[in-house]
């Protein structure tokens, strides 16, 4: 059964075309959904809707300032439709993931990764936030980063946290 209905909106220049982003987003999020379902995450009986907004630094800075009180651009923001904890059954609307192109490009260059690989990581990261995963504490970060790493491995990508010193 299809678990997700992935909707995308492109709100800034410089992103790949809509068909390419939709295919990439669907492949990544379907894989992530299948992975967490195999780990025991329940899903609604109908496909759950998740929206991805591909924007730029100016737009995400305004959103980040309004919703998080941080007046600076960031790579990805997630807005769950309903607050849930990991393992809770979500409703038919998962929420929104907003990604900023310039920050993704800058970070990919700094990390010496392709833009697609870094974008894939950020999509998975944002998707897990919609299921209540977080990284505010060391234990939460360990759980979330472990899931991200295993999901990304299934997509053929290496551990994005390898070599980082824990905070």
From Swiss-Prot:
Needed co-factor(s): Zn(2+)
Cross-referenced InterPro entries: MetalPrtase_cat_dom_sf_prd, YbeY, YbeY_CS
EC number: 3.1.-.-
GO MF terms held by the record: metalloendopeptidase activity; RNA endonuclease activity; zinc ion binding
Gene that encodes the chain: ybeY
High-level lineage: Bacteria, Pseudomonadati, Pseudomonadota, Alphaproteobacteria, Hyphomicrobiales
GO biological process: rRNA processing
Location of the protein in the cell: Cytoplasm
Family according to the record: Belongs to the endoribonuclease YbeY family.
Cellular compartments per GO CC: cytoplasm
Cofactor annotation comment: Binds 1 zinc ion.
Principal place of residence: cytoplasm
Covalent S-S links between cysteines: none
Keywords noted in UniProt: Cytoplasm, Endonuclease, Hydrolase, Metal-binding, Nuclease, Ribosome biogenesis, rRNA processing, Zinc
Residues that bind Zn(2+): 125, 129, 135
The protein's name in its UniProt record: Endoribonuclease YbeY
Enzyme class: hydrolase
Annotated function: Single strand-specific metallo-endoribonuclease involved in late-stage 70S ribosome quality control and in maturation of the 3' terminus of the 16S rRNA.
PANTHER family for this protein: ENDORIBONUCLEASE YBEY, CHLOROPLASTIC
